[in-house]
A protein has these predicted regions:
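Short, charged phosphate-coordinating catalytic segments
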Residues: 1-32, 138
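Short, basic (Lys/Arg/His-rich) helix/loop patches that form interaction surfaces
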Residues: 4, 53, 69-79, 83-142, ...
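A short, basic/aromatic helix-end/turn motif that makes direct DNA contacts
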Residues: 13-19, 141-147, 155-158
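ATP/adenylate-binding site constellation spanning eukaryotic-like Ser/Thr protein kinases
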Residues: 16, 60, 124, 146, ...
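C-terminal secondary-structure termini that scaffold catalytic or DNA-interacting sites
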Residues: 23, 31-59, 64-65, 69-74, ...
């Protein structure tokens, strides 16, 4: 989630037939949501959300490991296996309820002794890290699958105080030298 900037529903709605580990691409076109008490796989938020997403090696390796884990779960579950075709499932192959994922995420954070944050904060963190790495805003917009650049820059990006300090220092130096 953090590396790809996925929304919780996009992660939980990702199916194996939308992941190409050989070419290293995931096609994010669906999301899993609870609607009127029922889990439903629905199209993503916007057309720009459906863009193919290149998978960094760390993600491809994690997904390959997930396939192995799923195969073990399928064997252990036996006839109780309810294969949904989704990448992330319960030990019986059923979709993971978004609320349960939130609880699991928070429990893992607490166990790792890191600050417990909302799942969606990983998406904002992804955007902020892309900014800190000087990734062009249009590239960040594509990674986060936003339809408007303003959403990427205004809502998700947080400029660090160190970045602000450095920018003002550079500006001050330029003005002090009479360059501008």
């Amino acid at each position: 989630m953090l590396i790809l900037g996925l929304r919780r529903g996009e992660l939980l709605g990702l199916a194996w037939d939308e992941v190409d580990l050989e070419s290293g691409v995931a096609h994010i076109a669906w999301q899993l949501q609870r609607i009127k008490g029922e889990l439903q796989r629905r199209p993503t938020k916007t057309a720009s959300s459906e863009a193919p997403l290149p998978l960094p090696d760390i993600c491809s390796r994690a997904l390959a490991q997930r396939k192995v884990t799923e195969a073990r779960s399928r064997l252990a579950a036996g006839e109780a296996w309810m294969g949904s075709g989704l990448v992330f499932t319960t030990r019986f192959g059923t979709p993971i309820d978004p609320r349960n994922f939130q609880r699991f995420f928070q429990a893992r954070a607490a166990k790792a002794d890191v600050p417990v944050i909302p799942v969606h904060a990983t998406r904002r963190t992804c955007a902020s890290l892309l900014v800190a790495l000087d990734v062009h805003p249009r590239v960040a917009m594509t990674i986060l699958r936003h339809s408007q650049i303003a959403v990427t820059m205004d809502i998700y990006s947080q400029v660090s105080s160190a970045s602000t300090k450095e920018a003002l220092k550079l500006l001050g130096n330029q003005l002090g030298e009479g360059v501008l």
